[in-house]
Amino acid sequence: MLHRINPVRFSMQSCQRYFSKLVSPLEQHKSNTFTNRVRIPIEAGQPLHETRPFLIKSGELTPGISALEYYERRIRLAETLPPKSCVILAGNDIQFASGAVFYPFQQENDLFYLSGWNEPNSVMILEKPTDSLSDTIFHMLVPPKDAFAEKWEGFRSGVYGVQEIFNADESASINDLSKYLPKIINRNDFIYFDMLSTSNPSSSNFKHIKSLLDGSGNSNRSLNSIANKTIKPISKRIAEFRKIKSPQELRIMRRAGQISGRSFNQAFAKRFRNERTLDSFLHYKFISGGCDKDAYIPVVATGSNSLCIHYTRNDDVMFDDEMVLVDAAGSLGGYCADISRTWPNSGKFTDAQRDLYEAVLNVQRDCIKLCKASNNYSLHDIHEKSITLMKQELKNLGIDKVSGWNVEKLYPHYIGHNLGLDVHDVPKVSRYEPLKVGQVITIEPGLYIPNEESFPSYFRNVGIRIEDDIAIGEDTYTNLTVEAVKEIDDLENVMQNGLSTKFEEDQVAPL
């Protein structure tokens, strides 16, 4: 176990002192150009300013978010805790698709939100022994340095690096979890841990901690009686912090939305013959424009496939008499964008397509206008308003004359959700509380007309969804995805005439 002696670091200077043991001086390795820059031999498990100066600015731990902001998040959480308490968060493990084929790593987002740590097989503990916030202890248990493993899997920051880079007060090898954790639990009265976690129930560390706390395994022998401990969930408490975005978070999300929106415009200007090609095109544009990856598995649904809300097969042929519904966006620095657009494969709306599309767009426009804190609307209030608006639009189209119709059948999903590190950020946040300044929500009404004889033939097998990301202000709002065109005249102009603005390819410094 290592214990921090030096004060908490909010710049990369102490990181440089640490790594000067490996390289001296660091400056001799730096270059003014990306192409000629010599790699600095710093052994860390994720990008740092020293290794990726074009991606991470000095003082930042992750793109756009400083070490100071991560520290402030931990302190805000500690302020809500009683003395003699600890929060335990189990990070995610590498997940395998088949045999040795693994999925890209995705960190448990509560742990990431509080630490910026993006390496697998780790546990974070935030301990508050007294009333004084200055006594708060930030523990990290992480994979130790291992030359053999790092040769095959990549560098690790290690037990020392998690202190010097990520400001952990105390750190230890994750291999010592069974000895380390009982000591902390024994000396605290309140244990905050999500026993019923749905985010990482397969994590080996989660299972170990759970068995320690519920007595289901043999790992609790080193514990004093757990019966006199109060065990409470923590994710809902963290969710209340996560739902209000800082200016830095909003800046990242605005950039992710901008890149994603411009990528959609690039797609509008091309004709595609199959869903997988359009899927791949958008993926390339998100990454080339500066995002890290897709924010989620995209929906690329042509024709009747669009009637499935979360269709992700993306393997069908696209015909000119159909529309395609795409729900896709990029992620930057861990923060998601979320965009849905629907457009005709032919490049021009038919009269029926135009009428249905305008109905959805009218509802979306009116709902976005409600996204101000001063209106005192909740997300549920906006949803109820969208139902009323959609009923009127359907009546205008004559669909109210269809026997047995109801708006819930044709518009079966919710108007939107919170957005952030998770694409649904975070489910535990109430839909019924008034929206607050700094929240980011999606507004995404939709219409899905089934292939049933009771509906006019020209409307059947058409699914339309239009979605944007909206940041709540006091008396205004900001559309974070405004670049993605959606007005019919604008769409047809791009589809038929292309784009006049150049898309910035192969971005290395998105922020």
Swiss-Prot record:
GO terms for cellular component: mitochondrial inner membrane; mitochondrion; nucleus. One of its GO terms (biological process) is protein processing. InterPro entries: Aminopep_P_N (IPR007865), Creatin/AminoP/Spt16_N (IPR029149), Creatinase/aminopeptidase-like (IPR036005), Pept_M24 (IPR000994), Peptidase_M24B_aminopep-P_CS (IPR001131), X-Pro_dipept-like (IPR052433). It is a peripheral membrane protein. Keywords: Aminopeptidase, Hydrolase, Manganese, Membrane, Metal-binding, Metalloprotease, Mitochondrion, Mitochondrion inner membrane, Nucleus, Protease. It comes from the Eukaryota. Mn(2+) 1 binds at D338, H417, E444, E467. Mn(2+) 2 binds at D327, D338, E467. It catalyses: The enzyme cleaves the 36-Pro-Pro-37 bond of cysteine desulfurase (EC 2.8.1.7) removing three amino acid residues (Tyr-Ser-Pro) from the N-terminus after cleavage by mitochondrial processing peptidase. Its EC number is 3.4.11.26. Its cofactor is Mn(2+). GO terms for molecular function: aminopeptidase activity; manganese ion binding; metalloaminopeptidase activity. Binds 2 manganese ions per subunit. It is found in: Nucleus; Mitochondrion inner membrane. Aminopeptidase which cleaves preprotein intermediates that carry destabilizing N-ter amino acid residues after the mitochondrial processing peptidase (MPP) cleavage site and is thus critical for stabilization of the mitochondrial proteome. Present with 5080 molecules/cell in log phase SD medium. PANTHER family: XAA-PRO AMINOPEPTIDASE 3. Belongs to the peptidase M24B family. This is Intermediate cleaving peptidase 55.
